[in-house]
Amino acid sequence: MQHFFYKLILSYDGTCYYGYQKQPQKITVQQTFEKALKKMTHQNIPTFAASRTDKGVHSQGQTLHFQTTFFLKPTHFQKTLNYLLPPDIRVRQMNFATPNFHARYSAKSKIYQYVFSKKPLNAFNHHFQIFADKLYFDKITKALKFIEGTHNFFAFTSETQPKNFSKTIFQAFLKETSHKYILVFHGNGFLKYMIRFLVGSLIEIGKNKLSLEQFQAMLLGNTTKKATLLAPSKALVLKKIFY
């Protein structure tokens, strides 16, 4: 029986979901997507994603792949899935994939963004950003440069026994618009809670609660101090996956 391989880009508002990955008794993005996929194909089809985003984290560029004996042109597949999915999950793009493509293991790098509002939050934006209340962004900009390069990020994760705490950050910078400050992180991979702990430390730097020297020592492994402030998940967005 012939199998067909599909790759798609998924965007979602993570507010109402208990993260991306399936969990018992929890409503997640993966569970919701696979439910729509089963309704369409009448098959139990496992899907594989590039990133397992946390509860409340959003995506504009999550990448998935799956295989099935069900055939439909990707454009028609995309249209039908979007009809079956809730409005806070959208298939942005869908194509055929090669049999050796893997959404997670074929990924070369990822971009995440963390969004601060310059003004107090309102009813229409409070799910997607946090208020930049009395933060010194000149200090945060200096600290971002320390993050670039290959480091042991043990101080910035809840994990205790991964194979390797080393990650390479190609770019870490601040982007400013008329209404927002956006922290951009482009790296070859990220540990559990790594970006949120980094952002939490940057917030502490911006409030003069953590020095640049202390932050750099944490990145260099010259201290036993670990990050303690976990930034809220709602302002974090998975922007893009590179292959």
Swiss-Prot record:
UniProt keywords, alphabetically: Isomerase, tRNA processing
Reaction(s) catalysed (UniProt annotation): uridine(38/39/40) in tRNA = pseudouridine(38/39/40) in tRNA
Top-level enzyme category: isomerase
Keyword Isomerase: yes
GO BP term (any one): tRNA pseudouridine synthesis
Entry function: Formation of pseudouridine at positions 38, 39 and 40 in the anticodon stem and loop of transfer RNAs.
The protein's name: tRNA pseudouridine synthase A
Organism: Onion yellows phytoplasma (strain OY-M)
Top-level taxonomy: Bacteria, Bacillati, Mycoplasmatota, Mollicutes, Acholeplasmatales
